[in-house]
């Protein structure tokens, strides 16, 4: 395996069964990696939107309390609505954790694809990241 970038239409990507032996196969592989990079950028924006929606849906005092921690002088009693709010916060946090795991897995797949040192794959990742950023980041400003 070369330790420098090469232009080639032959490569083994991520798994042994993903062997590329033709220009058509390389073009399809670049497309798959490009889409993975776009998905990675989309998930980053999705995580930010999910956190923003979660914090908006909670009352201001509760969302600040969950971020900053409970007050020192709070008593041990909690109301039913407080418990529901905590459960909803936990479920949102659990969902964000799952989305984060998916983002990490996709990120490592993209990184390992680049580590094939194939220039076409590298360019696909760069282009996919650019396209994903271009498409996804304007969604952050939408409410």
Swiss-Prot record:
Pfam families: Ctr (PF04145). The chain crosses the membrane at residues 23-43, 94-114, 120-140. Keywords: Copper, Copper transport, Cytoplasmic vesicle, Endosome, Ion transport, Lysosome, Membrane, Phosphoprotein, Transmembrane, Transmembrane helix, Transport, Ubl conjugation. The modification Phosphoserine is found at residue 77. Ubiquitinated; ubiquitination and the subsequent proteasomal degradation are prevent by SLC31A1 that stabilizes it. It is a multi-pass membrane protein. The keyword Ribosomal protein does not apply. Disruption phenotype: Homozygous knockout mice lacking Slc31a2 grow normally, with no obvious developmental defects. GO terms for biological process: copper ion import; copper ion transport; intracellular copper ion homeostasis; regulation of copper ion transmembrane transport. Disulfide bonds: none annotated. GO terms for cellular component: late endosome; late endosome membrane; lysosomal membrane; membrane; plasma membrane; recycling endosome; recycling endosome membrane. Its main location: membrane. Belongs to the copper transporter (Ctr) (TC 1.A.56) family. SLC31A subfamily. This is Protein SLC31A2. The gene is Slc31a2.
